[in-house]
């Protein structure tokens, strides 16, 4: 026997696949026949079923958006123009969450592009960041008619997608803009004035509630309190004030 012929040759992958299939069929037959002394449990059969399968690709913003598709899960789909998923840095340290798209967002399919978006841009600039540094999204992805507050059934449908977005981005901080965003993420039925001014915990992420930019447009006297909230975020992010 030559040296080359004595080397161990790799076993084709199809051999292992066939072996797994044979073991699975044998154990299933034994389980159905009432045989004892062998592990024919559903867990073992399930383990064998998954052997050799490629692991599912990791979750991404693209897969979440694909899962949303042309969403028809709640009544907001009847009046929307565009679904507004979110935009910004997919690895952002700071994520802003609003309640839902407005008129301009619905027309353009992008978050915070109307007058509230201009106000938010000024806030982002004031904390020495840009839109490219942060991620922007909303609790609900479709505009509520006449910009009303999202209803509980609409939030219940959309919230799991927001939670998945947050899990993928893994920000260090979340700024919840307005009562709907803060209450939805924190599960606390308190007014935004009672929630703001301090950090809360959201699954290990520091969450700061503050007033929504649209609210500030109509109540400019609340800008000072909002700035105090943003300064707390700046300090925690290590930015000089």
Region annotations inferred by a language model:
Residues 1, 6-9:
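Intrinsic-disorder/low-complexity detector
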Residues 2-3, 14, 21, 25-241:
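A polyanion-binding, active-site-adjacent surface
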